[in-house]
Structures are given as structure tokens and as C-alpha cells.
């Protein structure tokens, strides 16, 4: 058993309370390799932002759970080396079983998500409560989910979304004891968050997605005043990255994300954690593809992973400073 406290990490409890009171959201950036982790820490130290290092089950397998634990500890020390002791959470994204959540807690995660949203309601409650009961013994915080997000990201796949029913949230939170709640109000996983028929097109022919269901969010806030709410699938899919990828050998068709002005609006509400994964993938892929085309003789990984890391840092700083409002809150 490894305690996250021995790694220098924190859980989400105080972080979320401050975010709700301050009207901003904590960035939850998905991470599975060294360059991503370096970019996240560099950006959040420079922006003086708290951060959640978010790891999916697939990323945990990819990075190896033991290496990941030491990478997280290294991230804490790296932030100090850069001159800022920012609050850092190590969080399991979309845990789908008690066993996986327990394993992460035992290996030093400070926060876990148990996603039983695909199960019948009472089974979701029972599974979530089982994880909460174990996690809280070690002061690890737990995120549950009500409602289903469409899209594909790592092992998470759903063809259709189901909006969160505000009438269920009080019962779910009281029965499970979760510390935060992921909801479905129209966000979606992946870089193709909406089908073309769900969108309109602007003068340049780029898809314009439908508005998020802020009415549902408002109802949930009324039911659970001051309770931490989480948005998954909140990448904006910057079209400049899509264009670079597609003009350098890629084939991303009709890629569309959540407009940043809608995320700014959400961050000012009870939404205190906003998950961003696909934007980071796009930033890295755009930088690497451009180098492969422009410098075809290059074969030193540092010469393409380094610029990809720099592009990631720029993206993450933008999210902290101009979208989520977390800059200066560490």
C-alpha cells in the first residue's frame, strides 16, 4: 500500500471547494507519457494553476503502474524545481470496476472515478458506494457519474448519450457518498463529438455544434447547491490543429469540439473540474506530423517529441489562463 500523501499529492476536496467559491474550474489533463507530464507541469507552474493529472485505465497499462507512480512523484518534485509547489492530484479516469479503483488507490492515486453510468441505476449506486467506502478509509476522493456521454476515448465507448436527470442527483450523492459528480449535458468523448447532422456549418464550412444543456446544469445546481460537478469530453478540437494534421498526411473528417466560450460559462458555475484529452492528442499529433513532412530526414525522437511538448505546454497554458480561469489559483 502506497499513500498518495507520501508522494506529495493531494486529493480533490479542498481544491474543488476553492474552485466553486472562486468561480473557476480545475484542469484535468489526461497523461500517459513523459512529454505530456512535462508539458502539464511546466504550463501549470508558469500559470500558477492547480492541476489534475488524469490517467485512464489504458494509459495506466501503457505507462506501467509502477513507473506511473514514480512519474507522479517526480511531477511534484519537478514543479518544486521549477519554483512552485502547486497542488497536484493523480486521478483515475473512468474506472470501470471496484478492483481497478482499489488497485489505483493502493498504488498511490489520490482520486479515482468509478463510472457505473452504463449500469442500471441501483447497480451504479451499489458499485459507486463500494468504491467510496474503500477510498475514504485512505482519504482518497471519488468521482461518480450519472448520465452517459457518447463518443469514443480509450476504453470508453457509447454510441448515444443520455442526459443526466436532475431528479436523480440528490439520491445518488446521498446514497453513495461521492465527493464529485460527472454529469452529461451534451459534451462527448473524442475529436468527433457531434455528427454533422447535429450541427450547422459556418461560412467556412466548419461544423458548429449545438449548445450545451445549461438548463440541466442549472437544475442540478439547484438540487445540489455547492456540490462539485465534473464535465467530461470537454476538448474544443482547435481547428488550427485539425488543419495542420490534414495538410500533413492526416485524415480527420468533420472533427468538432466544445466551443471555449461554453466552457468558460461552465467554469463559472458549480463545474469545478473540466476534462481535456483530445486537444492534447491533436496538439502533439499536429506538431509531430508537421516535422515528419517538413524534415523527412529527421529521426531523433527528441527533435519531434520536444516541439510536440512545447505545443502541448502552449495549449495547456491557454486553457488555464483563458478558458478555465484556474491561473493564479495555486
Short names for language-model regions:
Residues 2-7, 22-28:
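Terminal accessory/targeting
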Residues 2, 246-249, 258-330:
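C-terminal alpha-helical cap/extension of soluble enzyme domains
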Residues 7-21, 34-59, 65-85, 94-228, ...:
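Alpha/beta enzyme core
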Residues 1-2, 142:
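An N-terminal domain-start capping segment
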Residues 26-30, 90-91, 113, 229-231, ...:
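Short catalytic-loop micro-motif centered on adjacent basic/acidic residues
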Residues 29, 57-64, 89-90, 308:
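Short secondary-structure transition/capping motifs
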